[in-house]
Amino acid sequence: MSNIVGIEYNRVTNTTSTDFPGFSKDAENEWNVEKFKKDFEVNISSLDAREANFDLINIDTSIANAFRRIMISEVPSVAAEYVYFFNNTSVIQDEVLAHRIGLVPLKVDPDMLTWVDSNLPDDEKFTDENTIVLSLNVKCTRNPDAPKGSTDPKELYNNAHVYARDLKFEPQGRQSTTFADCPVVPADPDILLAKLRPGQEISLKAHCILGIGGDHAKFSPVSTASYRLLPQINILQPIKGESARRFQKCFPPGVIGIDEGSDEAYVKDARKDTVSREVLRYEEFADKVKLGRVRNHFIFNVESAGAMTPEEIFFKSVRILKNKAEYLKNCPITQ
């Protein structure tokens, strides 16, 4: 059976995978690790410190979706979990400010911390091995050198705006050595936390620990982790002249090209197509084009929140899935 998911005017066809043992008497479809190694491909389209776009080819939907879910909710990261206020005379309530601080992504390698043991008493639970302490001490005052007639709070006052960069790392115990080369800082220092006016101040300490996105979104290491199937566009009959230009406008820029010599439309880059099915609205193209998606070709887009690079996040998701498989394989209940 074809591995192309059909995209028609009012429906999607061939959506079910059939490549499993027993479906057809003419094909074994038995999974083979050597065949998988030979066929599986990873193509990287773009990669930087915050975003990655790559393809996983010849892999099952269940595995691709497992990677996506693990990146979102099971790869650990560090975030503020406990916030202790000493003074807060701003207009923002303690709990709201604590929530904002918790959502600030921190640039820290989660492998440098251990998990907090919830079974221990509170006085033994937090150590320099599992907890990072950040402090925030800001007071707003009038600026005596402010330009006359200015109405800009940034000119009139000192510390009128409190940003994530105002959170200061306070090493505990051996952390001054452990984090000597990579002090903990917010991944995005310009996140606005609060606005102050003269006389108002904020003084607090935030204790940051390991967590996963499945417990709270603040621990998710990604802003987004998504995939889509590779679009496929088959031109069944030649489309030329003005008809070719109308055909081209039915797709996003860069998807369809027009040959300068023959004035005929051709598929330039199907990857850029959003599969809007706009072309299927026109009867003149109804029998001239066939749309689809390749079932086993996944285009991933991963945006890091800043704590780790996208490739680190993906590799960690692979490791977690591998550990899950090992656990299932060796679990006593499966023996």
From Swiss-Prot:
Disulfide bond annotation, renumbered to this chain: none
Q: Which residues carry this modification: Phosphoserine?
A: S17
Which Gene Ontology terms describe the biological processes this protein takes part in?
Answer: nucleolar large rRNA transcription by RNA polymerase I; ribosome biogenesis; termination of RNA polymerase I transcription; termination of RNA polymerase III transcription; transcription by RNA polymerase I; transcription by RNA polymerase III; transcription elongation by RNA polymerase I; transcription initiation at RNA polymerase I promoter
Please provide an example of a Pfam family that matches this protein in its UniProt record.
RNA_pol_L
Task: Kindly list the places in or outside the cell where this protein is found, as annotated in its UniProt entry.
Answer: Nucleus, Nucleolus
Q: Which residues carry this modification: N-acetylserine?
A: S2
Q: Which residues form the signal peptide?
A: none
Query: What keywords sit in the KW lines?
Result: Acetylation, DNA-directed RNA polymerase, Nucleus, Phosphoprotein, Ribosome biogenesis, Transcription
A Gene Ontology CC term for this entry? RNA polymerase I complex
The record's listing under SMART domains reads: RPOLD (SM00662)
Q: Which GO terms describe its molecular function?
A: DNA binding; DNA-directed RNA polymerase activity; protein dimerization activity
Transferase as a keyword of this entry, yes or no, is: no
- Quote the CDD domains the UniProt record gives: RNAP_I_II_AC40
- Give the stretches traversing the membrane: none
Predominant subcellular localization, coarse grouping: nucleus
Family, similarity comment: Belongs to the archaeal Rpo3/eukaryotic RPB3 RNA polymerase subunit family.
What's this chain's function? DNA-dependent RNA polymerases catalyze the transcription of DNA into RNA using the four ribonucleoside triphosphates as substrates. Common component of RNA polymerases I (Pol I) and III (Pol III) which synthesize ribosomal RNA precursors and small RNAs, such as 5S rRNA and tRNAs, respectively. RPC40 is part of the polymerase core and may function as a clamp element that moves to open and close the cleft.
Q: Which HAMAP family match?
A: RNApol_arch_Rpo3
Additional free-text comment from the UniProt record: Present with 13000 molecules/cell in log phase SD medium.
Q: How does it assemble?
A: Component of the RNA polymerase I (Pol I) complex consisting of 14 subunits: RPA135, RPA190, RPC40, RPA14, RPB5, RPO26, RPA43, RPB8, RPA12, RPB10, RPC19, RPC10, RPA49 and RPA34. The complex is composed of a horseshoe-shaped core containing ten subunits (RPA135, RPA190, RPB5, RPO26, RPB8, RPB10, RPC10, RPA12, RPC19 and RPC40) where RPA135 and RPA190 form the DNA-binding cleft. Outside of the core, RPA14 and RPA43 form the stalk that mediates interactions with transcription initiation factors and newly synthesized RNA.
Which NCBIfam families does the record associate with it? PRK00783.1 (NF001988)
Q: What is this protein called?
A: DNA-directed RNA polymerases I and III subunit RPAC1
